[in-house]
């Protein structure tokens, strides 16, 4: 139902010009309230030598990962590619949703689904592929959950001239077959994970031939694949600092766009590893850390994967097989059996180390929802605003609606900004299951933290 308003409400979006694409990424490392704990070598439990990572990652990405420079220049070629794929992305006001909810809150959203691949993931995919190409790397290997990251890297490889191989979590591989097709259109090889390609995959399939997979397992497979080919390197879609830094183009654009409207009181995003949440929030968090502003930051996760709300802040592996360095983060344990929810991009046992620090200091507050209440919110949003959110992004939508209803109860004109990180047009199986009453909610009664290693110096 369309709820008509006044002529003043016609101004309900902000679209920047190509020349306003940010020229620098924001690196939060020098502004964190405490130094980031170093990654540990899994063989020695000592701080890892960055040189050891060059067999896995492109060298420039390792440099960015540990850089203390607050701002890092975006290469001209990457900015040109950003313009090609749909940056800057629009910022909208959800006026019809506000009226349907009868809330005094004002709701704005940054729409990353406007990119050609349909999500925020292309922001770091282009950067990672660009640096890999410059270093003579021939092939990139990665994991993907819902397929958004795999799609983004597949297109980046096609645009820049790199081969791409994707290990897609088995549950999503079968839930979202059109994602696989899209990746293949862009020229990528796509395998369900666990797969028969790697020893890691074979081991998990022996344990359970119908294993739904997880991002942790897919990461293990991708790394094993990379270690077998000198010309290949690994690309990661979330968690690490350089990935989150590339995503700050979202928040840097949004900071310009909100000036056309008003400053937010609350900033909300969904969280799996943390990249889309960080992309929007980190430029605003900088103002809080500098004492220049006050915002409330809400990070939303599935109750089936309660990393932030029930996890432990300690050192753990970033993958399921223990091939990666150990990083200090909120974790459910790298052996946690992740239920096959439709939000495939949120099926990860850990959390970005930088976001973990901010959460540990109370700067970011976590929330968790079941997938049925998430899809309920997504359907309402689609009817109100016409955009079908990705199941991952719909977690943020659920929190936004609840925050707007809270403002209604309190009679407060709360200004809410959230990241609608992707559209759900290739995720309609989840919506079908919701509409037909087939969705299952999962909530772990026992968390498997037995494999979360805790070195003597861990807090």
From Swiss-Prot:
State its role: The beta subunit is responsible for the synthesis of L-tryptophan from indole and L-serine.
Q: Which family does it belong to?
A: Belongs to the TrpB family.
Output this protein's name. Tryptophan synthase beta chain
According to the UniProt record, what class of enzyme is this?
A: lyase
Q: Which reaction does it catalyse?
A: (1S,2R)-1-C-(indol-3-yl)glycerol 3-phosphate + L-serine = D-glyceraldehyde 3-phosphate + L-tryptophan + H2O
Asked if the keyword Amino-acid biosynthesis belongs to this entry, the reply reads: yes
One Pfam match, given by its short name, reads PALP
The record describes its quaternary structure and partners as:
Tetramer of two alpha and two beta chains.
The organism encoding this protein is Pyrococcus horikoshii (strain ATCC 700860 / DSM 12428 / JCM 9974 / NBRC 100139 / OT-3)
Iron found in the keyword field:
no
Transmembrane stretches in the record are none
Q: What is its EC number?
A: 4.2.1.20
- Write out the pathway annotation from the protein's UniProt entry: Amino-acid biosynthesis; L-tryptophan biosynthesis; L-tryptophan from chorismate: step 5/5
Q: Point out residues bearing the modification N6-(pyridoxal phosphate)lysine.
A: 121
Q: Which InterPro entries match?
A: Trp_synth_b-like, Trp_synth_b_CS, Trp_synth_beta, Trp_synth_beta/beta-like, TrpB-like_PALP, TrpB-like_PALP_sf
Cofactor needs: pyridoxal 5'-phosphate
């Amino acid at each position: 139902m369309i709820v008509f308003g006044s002529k003043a409400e016609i101004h309900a979006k902000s679209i920047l010009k190509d020349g306003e694409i940010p020229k620098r990424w924001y690196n939060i490392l020098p502004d964190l309230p405490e130094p980031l704990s170093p990654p540990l070598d899994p063989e020695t439990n000592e701080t890892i030598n960055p040189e050891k990572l060059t067999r896995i990652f492109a060298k420039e990405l390792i440099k960015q990962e540990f850089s203390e420079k607050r701002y890092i220049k975006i290469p001209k070629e990457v900015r040109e590619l950003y313009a090609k794929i749909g940056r800057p992305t629009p910022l909208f006001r959800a006026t019809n949703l506000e009226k349907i909810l009868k809330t005094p809150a004002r709701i704005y959203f940054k729409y990353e689904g406007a990119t050609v691949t349909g999500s925020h993931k292309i922001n770091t995919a282009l950067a990672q592929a660009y640096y890999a190409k410059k270093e003579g790397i021939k092939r990139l290997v990665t994991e993907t959950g819902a397929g958004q990251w795999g799609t983004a890297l597949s297109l980046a490889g096609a645009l820049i001239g790199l081969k791409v191989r994707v290990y897609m979590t088995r549950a999503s591989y079968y839930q979202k077959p059109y994602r696989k097709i899209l990746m293949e259109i862009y020229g990528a090889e796509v395998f369900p994970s666990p797969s028969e390609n790697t020893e890691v995959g074979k081991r998990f399939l022996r344990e359970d031939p119908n294993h739904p997979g997880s991002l942790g397992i897919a990461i293990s497979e991708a790394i094993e694949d990379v270690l077998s080919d000198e010309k290949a390197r690994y690309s990661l879609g979330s968690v690490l600092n350089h990935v989150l830094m590339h995503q700050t183009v979202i928040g840097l654009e949004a900071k310009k766009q909100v000036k056309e409207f008003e400053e937010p009181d609350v900033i909300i995003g969904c969280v799996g590893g943390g990249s889309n949440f960080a992309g929007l929030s980190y430029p605003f968090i900088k103002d809080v850390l500098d004492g220049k502003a006050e915002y409330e930051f809400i990070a939303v996760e599935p109750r089936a994967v309660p990393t932030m709300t029930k996890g432990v802040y300690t050192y753990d592996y970033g993958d399921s097989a223990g091939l990666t360095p150990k990083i200090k983060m909120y974790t459910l344990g790298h052996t946690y059996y992740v239920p096959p929810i439709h939000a495939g991009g949120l099926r990860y046992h850990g959390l970005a180390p930088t976001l973990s620090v901010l959460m540990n200091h109370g700067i970011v507050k976590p929330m968790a929802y079941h997938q049925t209440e998430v899809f309920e919110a997504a359907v309402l949003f689609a009817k109100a605003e016409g955009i079908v959110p990705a199941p991952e992004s719909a977690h943020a939508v659920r929190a936004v609606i609840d925050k707007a209803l809270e403002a209604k109860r309190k009679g407060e004109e709360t200004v809410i900004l959230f990241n609608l990180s992707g559209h759900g047009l290739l995720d309609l199986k989840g919506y079908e299951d919701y509409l037909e009453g087939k969705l299952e909610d999962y909530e772990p009664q026992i968390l498997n933290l037995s494999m979360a290693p805790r070195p003597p110096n861990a807090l």
